[in-house]
């Protein structure tokens, strides 16, 4: 896992993240990737200096609402998703948040299974879990 480097997103990351999204999903949702929006937090995972995935979230009360976790198809199975979740959860804990909620489609069985292995339970629009209190 040590070759995956995660960092906070920067304003200049938008084009590269949109390319990743287009590669994985066909059409990029340009509104979903806004590292320059002060209401969003974006974490970028890199492998060998290239973007391998990202997570986009926002705080809603005591909940970190994760709108998207995306890993490039070529980089799946290389612990990119685990590292992004580690960063999301650490961000939530460091801000005293109580829960993480991740949007994931019901039909996306591989993602739901991945989150279940990480302790997330199904909820109305995705999965969620409580954060530890430090």
How would you label these PLM feature ranges?
Residues 2-3, 42-43, 98-134:
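C-terminal "cap" of GNAT-fold acetyltransferases
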Residues 2-4, 8-67, 72, 85-86, ...:
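Acetyl-CoA-dependent GNAT
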Residues 71, 77-90, 113-117:
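Conserved acetyl-CoA-binding loop-helix of GNAT-fold acetyltransferases
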Residues 78, 95-98:
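Short coil/turn segments at alpha/beta junctions that flank glycine-rich nucleotide-binding fingerprints
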Residues 89, 93, 102-104:
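Short acidic/polar micro-motifs centered on Gly/Asp/Asn
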């Amino acid at each position: 896992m040590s070759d995956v480097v995660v960092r906070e997103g920067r304003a200049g990351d938008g084009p590269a993240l949109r390319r990743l999204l287009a590669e994985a999903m066909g059409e990029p949702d340009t509104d979903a990737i806004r590292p320059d929006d002060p209401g969003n937090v974006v974490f970028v995972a890199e492998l060998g200096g290239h973007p391998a995935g990202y997570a986009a979230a926002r705080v809603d009360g005591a909940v970190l609402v994760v709108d998207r976790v995306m890993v490039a198809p070529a980089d799946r199975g290389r612990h990119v998703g685990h590292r992004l979740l580690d960063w999301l959860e650490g961000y939530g804990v460091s801000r005293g948040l109580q829960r993480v909620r991740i949007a994931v489609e019901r039909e996306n069985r591989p993602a739901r299974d991945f989150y279940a292995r990480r302790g997330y339970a199904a909820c109305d629009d995705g999965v969620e879990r409580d954060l530890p209190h430090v």
